[in-house]
């Protein structure tokens, strides 16, 4: 009986020791601390400053004048790639005043001016910033389409149209990688000499906005 009692006492002790052995196995603990999610950035710069301060300001233009009105570097300063949209806004034609030659040419109405119906402009992206029409370049056609370089080194005449023809948005014209530029956006103008009828635009001005949007 005494042996049986001792045996019964030994069994729980053995079980306890076995349990202690299970919980005494090797272990190691690691913790990943300070986990952080950070949003990327899209930051578009057009021209010499961010936000944009550049604009086209031309005065005293006359029939037969043609030149570059603006050259603006378009750059994605952000950490994310984006898709570029460009919009030429509504055109406002200002009469400003009617000179004697204007009246003689038949311009007797105010406040709308006639310059936007005579002056031609072209908007194009000089992707490699070479200053010439080359591979990778494109222009924004007044019908809302994008026309890419196919041949030649001179911007095609078809790139130009009357200012009044342009209000439009061109969507997704170019993918712009993070911290890279899209190229130089150039504004060209041409004031064709069509004779005495051009007098109706004397002193007139046309005003519009060009908006650049970088989308994810």
Can you name each region flagged by the protein language model?
Residues 62-95, 164-216:
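C-terminal, structured domain-capping segment
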Residues 17, 25-27, 70-145:
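Surface-exposed interaction patch
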Residues 2-63, 202-216:
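Short, polar/proline-rich extracytoplasmic segments that appear immediately after membrane translocation
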Residues 36, 44, 51, 55, ...:
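Short linear motifs in intrinsically disordered/low-complexity regions
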Residues 45-47, 89-91, 122-128, 139, ...:
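Predominantly extracellular/luminal cell-surface or secreted proteins
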